[in-house]
C-alpha cells in the first residue's frame, strides 16, 4: 500500500495516552487510502507501531553546544578534543526567559531614527549632499534638482547667446543688404512675439528674464538680453529660406491664372434638392406591432 499511494503529511493526535485527552499533536504520515485498491491488495492491513510517539524530535530537541568552537582544533589535528556534551532536557526547560514590552515612546523613536537614516541615504545616493543641501531649507529634493537644472541651462544659454551675437555681427559686415539676415522683415521664431516684448515696461523686463530663460530650452533660437540696448531684446533671425512678399505671391498667382484659363471659372455647386425641384418629404415612423411593447407604459 505504501508503494502504491503517496504519503501525505498530516497532524494527528498521539495515541500513547501520556497526557490523556490533552495530548500534543504528533507529526506523522497519513496514507491517501483508497478502498478500491484495498480490495485488490491481498496484503494484511497492519496498525501503526506502538512506539510512534516515543522518538519525536520536538520533545527532546538536539541542541549542539558551540557548533564552530572546536573547528580550528580539528583542522590542526589535535586529538585531545573532548566530545561535545549535550545539556539535559531538564536544564534547558528551566532557563528563565525575560520578556520586555516595548512602549510606544521607544517604537516612535526607533521609527523616527530609521526614517531619518533612510532619508539621508537617499540624499547621498541622489547627489543632494554634495552641494550642501539640507532638508530644512523648505525645498524638496525635486525642487532643488529643478533649480540646479535651470541654473545650468541659464549658463549654457548665456554662452550660446554670446557666440550667436558674434556670428551675426561678423556676417552683417561681410554680406550685402539683400540677405535675409539684414532684411527689414525678419521671421522671428521664438515663444514671445515682438509686440509682447516691446509692450513690457522697463521694470518688468528683469522679472520676465526668468521666464524667457525657462522657455528658451524648447525653442530653436534663444532669446537673449541685448548688451548694447539695455531696454530691449535681440531676436535671432531666421537663417533658412526667405519668406516671399505679398506682391510676389500675387504675381505668381496672376501668371498661373493666365496660363490656365479654366481656373477662371468658378466651381460648380451641385445641390440635388434644387436641381430635381422636389422637396424632401419627411417620412413617417415605420413602427411594427412588436415595437409597441417598448412604447407602451408599464401600467397597461
UniProtKB/Swiss-Prot annotation:
It is found in: Cytoplasm. It is an enzyme of class 1 (oxidoreductase). Residues 169-185 have a biased composition (Low complexity). Keywords: Cytoplasm, NADP, Oxidoreductase. GO terms for cellular component: cytoplasm. It comes from the Eukaryota. The keyword Cytoplasm applies. Residues 1-20, 75-95, 121-142, 162-245, 258-300 are annotated as: Disordered. One of its GO terms (molecular function) is oxidoreductase activity. Residues 191-209 have a biased composition (Polar residues). The keyword Cytoplasm applies. Its EC number is 1.-.-.-. Potential NADPH-dependent oxidoreductase. Belongs to the P33MONOX family. This is Putative monooxygenase p33MONOX. It comes from Xenopus laevis (African clawed frog). The gene is p33monox.
Amino acid at each position: 500500500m505504501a508503494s502504491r499511494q503517496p504519503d501525505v503529511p498530516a497532524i494527528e493526535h498521539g495515541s500513547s495516552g501520556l497526557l490523556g485527552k490533552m495530548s500534543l499533536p504528533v507529526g506523522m504520515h497519513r496514507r491517501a487510502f483508497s478502498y478500491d485498491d484495498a480490495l485488490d491488495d491481498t496484503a494484511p492491513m497492519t496498525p501503526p507501531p506502538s512506539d510512534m510517539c516515543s522518538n519525536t524530535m520536538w520533545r527532546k530537541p538536539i541542541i549542539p553546544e558551540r557548533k564552530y568552537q572546536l573547528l580550528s582544533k580539528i583542522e590542526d589535528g589535535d586529538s585531545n578534543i573532548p566530545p561535545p556534551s549535550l545539556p539535559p532536557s531538564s536544564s534547558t526547560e528551566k532557563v528563565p526567559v525575560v520578556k520586555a514590552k516595548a512602549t510606544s515612546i521607544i517604537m516612535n523613536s526607533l521609527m523616527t531614527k530609521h526614517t531619518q537614516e533612510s532619508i539621508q541615504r537617499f540624499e547621498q545616493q541622489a547627489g543632494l549632499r554634495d552641494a550642501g543641501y539640507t532638508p530644512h531649507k523648505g525645498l524638496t529634493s525635486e525642487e532643488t534638482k529643478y533649480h540646479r537644472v535651470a541654473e545650468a541651462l541659464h549658463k549654457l544659454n548665456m554662452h550660446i547667446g554670446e557666440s550667436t551675437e558674434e556670428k551675426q555681427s561678423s556676417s552683417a559686415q561681410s554680406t550685402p543688404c539683400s540677405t535675409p539676415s539684414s532684411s527689414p522683415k525678419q521671421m522671428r521664431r521664438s515663444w514671445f512675439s515682438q509686440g509682447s516684448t516691446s509692450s513690457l515696461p522697463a521694470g518688468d523686463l528683469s522679472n520676465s528674464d526668468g521666464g524667457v530663460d525657462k522657455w528658451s530650452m524648447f525653442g530653436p533660437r534663444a532669446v537673449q538680453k541685448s548688451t548694447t540696448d539695455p531696454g530691449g531684446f535681440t531676436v535671432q533671425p531666421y537663417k533658412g529660406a526667405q519668406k516671399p512678399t505679398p506682391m510676389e505671391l500675387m504675381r505668381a498667382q496672376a501668371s498661373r491664372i493666365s496660363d490656365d484659363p479654366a481656373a477662371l471659372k468658378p466651381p460648380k455647386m451641385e445641390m440635388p434638392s434644387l436641381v430635381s425641384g422636389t422637396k424632401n418629404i419627411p417620412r413617417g415612423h415605420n413602427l411594427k406591432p412588436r415595437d409597441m411593447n417598448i412604447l407602451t407604459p408599464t401600467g397597461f
